[in-house]
Amino acid sequence: MLYITGDTHGDFYRFGHLGLNKDDIMVILGDVGINYYLDECDKKLKERLKRYNFKFFCIQGNHEERPENISSYHEVEMFGGKVFVEDEYPNLIFAKNGELYNIDGKSILVIGGAYSIDKDYRISKGYQWFKDEQLTEQERLDILDKYSGKHVDIILSHTCPLRCEPKESFKLSLPQIAVDKSMEYFLNEVEQRVDYDKWYCGHYHLEKIVDKLEFMFGRIKSVDTGEFIPKYDFHNGYEIVRDACSQKDYKYCPGCKGDNIIIEKCEGHNINGLDFIAIICNDCKKVYGFNDVNYKPNCPKEL
């Protein structure tokens, strides 16, 4: 079966309880986190993922090196198209941008890449930034030439068409005029020229549906059934919903809107100046938080 989830950024806790087999495929919609440091840290993560029985089918995000730029990867034929793999980690598959695959009986077009809004900050601090994080002009033209007027079942991308941008996720401190939206404009063209049934993307760290496009983040969905796979904390059976919750005056559960909640700070976890928290709802049995690893130890004992 085919499953799909959003950005992982090196956090793979969500896959631990699934019990999938060698015939199952897990799509990660970019920013996977295994080609980020380009050193032993990446290798340790890959060694962990190597133990899973199922295959990971990864899309290129903006916070990772392209596999074609890493010497250990080589190009092979798989699922009716070209992919990148490493001999040591055959279940960790990276899609090639612009390729059309046949997976689980579905035709799937892959378009990775996006702009990093924190590019200048990363460069100034000496953090990783990847200069070819976005598709080149030639890559974009090739995709339009190849697929205009054609039908595909599914489009997988990291970012989204411009018209679908989730403005509620924009940073108020960052003027949008400073953001390179060339990929989003390009994906607008793709949407206009390519006939498709469903589109999945990541990048924005939220879950939302806009027409036939679905933003994915922390949850896992079965593409075959359209149902989300519950993501459980083994200690208490509460479903984990990986949404970003910033420190503010929460009075109600983000999901069921009930007031039977407990708020836990994530061990001082701080991102872009915001303290992130976990909201634990005793009514709908869900935990809302930014990062499983940070808040899982903080779940109250009474749960």
PLM-predicted stretches and their roles:
Residues 9-15, 33-38, 62-69, 101, ...:
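Active-site environment of divalent metal-dependent phosphoester hydrolases
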Residues 4-6, 26-31, 56-63, 95-96, ...:
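Active-site neighborhood of phospho(di)ester-bond hydrolases with catalytic His/Asp-centered motifs
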Residues 5, 10-103, 176:
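Core catalytic region of metal-dependent phosphoesterases/phosphodiesterases
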Residues 90, 104-181:
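Active-site-proximal loop/helix segment associated with metal-binding centers of metalloenzymes
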Residues 250, 278:
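Residues immediately within or flanking Cys/His clusters that coordinate Zn2+
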Residues 280-301:
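Short metal-binding segments enriched for Cys and/or His
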Residues 55-59, 77-78, 163-232:
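Conserved beta-sheet core of the metallophosphoesterase superfamily
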Residues 258-262, 289:
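Short functional micro-motifs and their immediate structural scaffolds
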